Amino acid sequence: YKWIDKKFSDEIKFTNINPDFIGINSDIKFPEKNHRNNFKKINNSFNWKSLDFKFVKDLENPKKNQLFYNPITDFNAYDGLILGFRLHNKTFKNKPSSVNIIPLYSSLEKKLIGTIQGIYNFHNEESSNFLTQISLRTQTYHYAPNLRYSTYKPTLNFVFRPDDFRSDIRKLLSFSWLSVNRDRSSSVQTDPNYGIGIIE
């Protein structure tokens, strides 16, 4: 741990210090909007951070990629008792991207079911369309004995706000497509699959 005092320069050169990582404002003593990019791992070409698993949602640690897990129990008529967990990276502060993975086990069908969702946010503070969001959600369960259904829902959201930043008014324009794929039942002759376009 070494404090380097260098004034009036945009470039700092390090020699023979062999660091594990380089941090700027590492103790967060100075307020800033985004401190996620304040740490650079050395000898890591992808700048991957180590994973930190937490049971309860916590304050963000900019040195690590945090994943939170929670146990889940549920029940429905075709899957019976459902057991599993939720794994996600959402913290109290909004992130550019988030994942939500929910692997579950159907006690009645003895098979894996669950949900996966990924969201990516594009922020533009200079525009009334200050947030554009792309997401993909897929899930699979059973709708009859030994018959599975799966849904896929890509979504594109445009979020608008007025020029007055003190206003809490928000407007949303949303485009999504819901695709439903079902295992074919011998008792039903029609195609069980369908898709729906949604504009909100």
Question: What residues fall within each predicted segment?
Answer:
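Generic surface-pattern signal
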Residues: H123, Q139-Y141, R161, L178
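Beta-strand-rich binding/interaction modules
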Residues: Y1-S26
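Low-complexity intrinsically disordered segments
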Residues: T132, K171-L173
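Outer-membrane beta-barrel initiation region
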Residues: I12-F14, N25-S128, N146, K153, ...
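A short acidic, often aromatic-flanked loop/helix-cap motif at beta-alpha or helix-coil junctions
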Residues: Y141-P145, R182
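A glycine-rich helix N-cap at a beta->alpha junction
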Residues: S127, T132-Y141, L156
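Short, well-ordered strand-loop elements centered on a beta-strand within folded domains, enriched
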Residues: Y1, F21-G23, V99, F130-L136
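Large, well-folded core regions of big proteins
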Residues: S174-S185
